[in-house]
Amino acid sequence: MAAMKYKGSVFIILVILLLSSSLLAHSSSTKSFFWLGETQDTKAMKKEKKIDGGTANEVEERQVPTGSDPLHHKHIPFTP
């Protein structure tokens, strides 16, 4: 008879744990913590962080210099 009470209490505890974890997983604030996939919140945050093209003046300022040695101010020949 004691074994039946033990099995019943274990079953009840398991049901409570499963229900509480499923309720926490469906709440919006903890969704990304419980699920491994991306949520809509994280996708929106990634879109906000993307760098846009900018205006024409900003794009002009970011152009890479061209020439014989655009990465160095002084041209020093390579000697082995």
From Swiss-Prot:
Residues 1-25 form the signal peptide. Keywords: Developmental protein, Differentiation, Hydroxylation, Secreted, Signal. GO terms for cellular component: apoplast. It comes from the Eukaryota. The modification Hydroxyproline is found at P65. The keyword Coiled coil does not apply. One of its GO terms (biological process) is maintenance of root meristem identity. GO terms for molecular function: receptor serine/threonine kinase binding. Residues 45-80 are annotated as: Disordered. Belongs to the CLV3/ESR signal peptide family. This is CLAVATA3/ESR (CLE)-related protein 40. It comes from Arabidopsis thaliana (Mouse-ear cress). The gene is CLE40.
